[in-house]
Structure formats: structure tokens, C-alpha cells
A protein has these predicted regions:
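Short S/T/G/P-rich N-terminal loop/turn motif that feeds into the first structured element of a domain
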Residues: 1-49, 53-65, 74-92
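Mid-chain, well-packed structural core segment of small domains
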Residues: 69-70
Length: 92
């Protein structure tokens, strides 16, 4: 079953998130299991909403691709992570 992952990166701004995204390079090397990704500013930091085929695929991506790039992007706090089961999604 697909899972939704909602992240809040406290204190992170657009410049830091863009640096993290550049290091992760998901646009050119699509993560296995990623269905949908969106991000933008939220109160107190940066928000991310992802849909993944499984929590395990998100965890692997986070460990292998996000983790190594966090410090280089200037991100110093751990994200708040909320998971929810995806009952349905529509895509164009």
C-alpha cells in the first residue's frame, strides 16, 4: 500500500532546501518508489509532501540520498515526519 509522508523541516528556507535538492538530484536520478513530490514554505520552515510505494523505499532514500546531503545544505534540525496510508490518489 502506498504511503504519504509529510515532512516539516524547521528553520529551513528555500535556499537551503534547493541546496539539499541539488545534492539529492532526484530530478535526474528518480528515486525508486517515489510516486509524487511537492514542497514549499510553511510556518517556521519548509514543508514536503511525498507519496511512496512503501515506507521502506522512503526510508532507504532518506538514508542513502538525503542523509549525506543534509549538513552540506546547512540543515541542522531533524525533520518532523508524519506518515499516513494513501487510500487513493489521482495523477495526470
Amino acid at each position: 500500500m502506498a504511503v504519504g509522508i509529510r515532512l516539516k523541516l524547521a528553520g529551513v528556507n528555500a535556499e537551503q532546501f534547493d541546496a539539499l535538492e541539488a545534492g539529492v538530484d532526484a530530478r535526474n536520478d528518480h528515486p525508486d518508489g517515489l510516486i509524487f513530490h511537492a514542497s514549499g514554505p510553511v510556518e517556521g520552515g519548509w514543508g514536503v509532501l511525498d507519496f511512496w510505494e512503501s515506507r521502506e523505499q522512503f526510508d532507504r532514500f532518506s538514508e542513502e540520498r538525503i542523509g549525506p546531503n543534509v549538513r552540506a545544505a546547512g540543515v541542522t534540525s531533524a525533520p518532523e515526519i508524519h506518515e499516513f496510508p494513501v487510500h487513493e490518489y489521482l495523477a495526470r
